[in-house]
Amino acid sequence: MVEFLNFEVLEDHGWALQDEDLFAKAADANLQSTDFGRFYVDPNDTLLEAAEKNGFAWPFACRGGACTNCAVAVVDGEMPSPASHILPPELTEKGIRLSCIAAPVSDDAKIVYNLKHLPEVSELLLPASRFEQASSTD
């Protein structure tokens, strides 16, 4: 089971990504279901695919680990990062992963999604329109 929280609500509530009780605060804050909730990840799905299957429109662009539009922070649980991706080691060491190519391997995980406003992540964003023009016949 993945418990998720939208990074954009942190500033509104005076919270920080490093807060130990971040998810307890979110549970008590009466947030919208798109900002805080839970869903299951099927074994063959990435985190992004699972979010979409559950009706959520999380940010992404390339779906291949070449940008940080889909970056998430793993607050609790295990979510290994595949070898091929754009994230520098200092971000992966902080628990940052790309939801388009990774999935939790622990039974439970706490994930903060929508990290595009985090300065270290925003430097590696790509415009989604760059990928919208690609097709399978290209």
Swiss-Prot record:
Protein name: Ferredoxin-2
Source species, domain of life: Archaea
Function, as annotated: Ferredoxins are iron-sulfur proteins that transfer electrons in a wide variety of metabolic reactions.
A molecular function (GO) term: 2 iron, 2 sulfur cluster binding
Cofactor binding remark: Binds 1 [2Fe-2S] cluster.
Family: Belongs to the 2Fe2S plant-type ferredoxin family.
Cofactor(s) for this UniProt protein: [2Fe-2S] cluster
NCBIfam families: Frdxn_Halo
Residue stretches making up the 2Fe-2S ferredoxin-type domain: 27-117
Chain sites annotated for binding [2Fe-2S] cluster: C62, C67, C70, C100
InterPro entries, sorted: 2Fe-2S_ferredoxin-like_sf (IPR036010), 2Fe-2S_ferredoxin-type (IPR001041), 2Fe2S_fd_BS (IPR006058), 2Fe2S_Ferredoxin (IPR053441), Beta-grasp_dom_sf (IPR012675)
Keywords, comma-separated and alphabetical: 2Fe-2S, Electron transport, Iron, Iron-sulfur, Metal-binding, Transport
Protein's organism: Haloarcula marismortui (strain ATCC 43049 / DSM 3752 / JCM 8966 / VKM B-1809)
